Amino acid sequence: MFHHISVMLNETIDYLDIKEDGIYVDCTLGGAGHALYLLNQLNDDGRLIAIDQDTTALDNAKEVLKDHLHKVTFVHSNFRELTDILKNLNIEKVDGIYYDLGVSSPQLDVPERGFSYHHDAKLDMRMDQTQQLSAYEVVNQWPYEALVKIFYRYGEEKFSKQIARRIETHREHQPIETTLELVDIIKEGIPAKARRKGGHPAKRVFQAIRIAVNDELSAFEDSIEQAIELVKVGGRISVITFHSLEDRLCKQMFQEYEKGPDVPRGLPIIPEAYTPKLKRVNRKPITATDTDLDENNRARSAKLRVAEILK
């Protein structure tokens, strides 16, 4: 059963300033909690485009949203294809777009998906189970230098070199097949003192591999750039992030589009081309409430950023 508790559900949707006949895009449908809350605010002229690359999530969402199916278009795709998705639906502009970038609880908790360092399973970590690249290929086939790079860049792991070297040594004898095999190897690469602090010792490397397998940061950057062009003037974009890499990227992109191009000196009037594309609705990220934390301890790291389109 696909059961997922949506984080900051009300805030994410309420900040979109919902119009009851508007067109909205859920880029990360997941457990459909945000979608259901939004659909309850739309009349029969409103519409939701619901995107997910996980077919299990889409199948579950059709059941969760069964009372609103006439208002929903389900799309099995990666959100980096946002422009093409809307073009294929003959939609030029929408009233709002939102993202929940967390890995859904079922993906983490179902051992067979290979995301969790708590359960033994084959190395997988594919959000889209139709794609070829999995964690198995990354761990067993990527060169030492590439592993060091992703562990450091995507996992901010200070022992990246030591862990990558351990992986390289082990796979010379036999392939690394399962999540718990990998956990043991990661532990070998981290000094005992360091293993006792900072959460689970495999957390950062598993995050890094997951991001690499699913090309998450690049896909998000591509998608946000498209979203900024696809939302109507006055429409909004809501983004929930769960780790510093995503949050930093979101913050930087919103700041860049809020700043606009450098204005040449001496102009009596600032041309529209030099005015900001958007404004940040909240200067600092919104964090989870005590209620969110009581329901879902994964909400502790969640941050919500919202931007409004100006032109």
Curated annotation (Swiss-Prot):
GO function terms (MF aspect): rRNA (cytosine-N4-)-methyltransferase activity
Principal subcellular localization: cytoplasm
Compartments (UniProt record): Cytoplasm
Gene3D superfamilies per UniProt: Putative methyltransferase TM0872, insert domain, Vaccinia Virus protein VP39
Keyword S-adenosyl-L-methionine applies: yes
Any one GO cellular component localisation term in the record: cytoplasm
Role of this protein: Specifically methylates the N4 position of cytidine in position 1402 (C1402) of 16S rRNA.
Homology family: Belongs to the methyltransferase superfamily. RsmH family.
Protein name: Ribosomal RNA small subunit methyltransferase H
Taxonomic source organism: Staphylococcus haemolyticus (strain JCSC1435)
